[in-house]
Curated annotation (Swiss-Prot):
Keywords: Amidation, Amphibian defense peptide, Antibiotic, Antimicrobial, Immunity, Innate immunity, Secreted. This is Aurein-1.1. GO terms for cellular component: extracellular region. The keyword Secreted applies. Expressed by the skin dorsal glands. It holds the Pfam family Antimicrobial20. GO terms for biological process: defense response to bacterium; innate immune response. Antimicrobial peptide with activity against B.cereus, L.lactis, L.innocua and S.uberis. Probably acts by disturbing membrane functions with its amphipathic structure. Inhibits the formation of NO by neuronal nitric oxide synthase (nNOS) at micromolar concentrations. Acts by a non-competitive mechanism, probably by binding to calcium/calmodulin and as a consequence blocking calmodulin attachment to nNOS. InterPro entries: Aurein_antimicrobial_peptide. It is found in: Secreted. It comes from Ranoidea raniformis (Southern bell frog). The keyword Protein transport does not apply.
Length: 13
């Protein structure tokens, strides 16, 4: 979902 993308970016940094 949309939150999955946010979590992915959060783990990217």
């Amino acid at each position: 979902g949309l939150f999955d993308i946010i979590k992915k970016i959060a783990e990217s940094i």
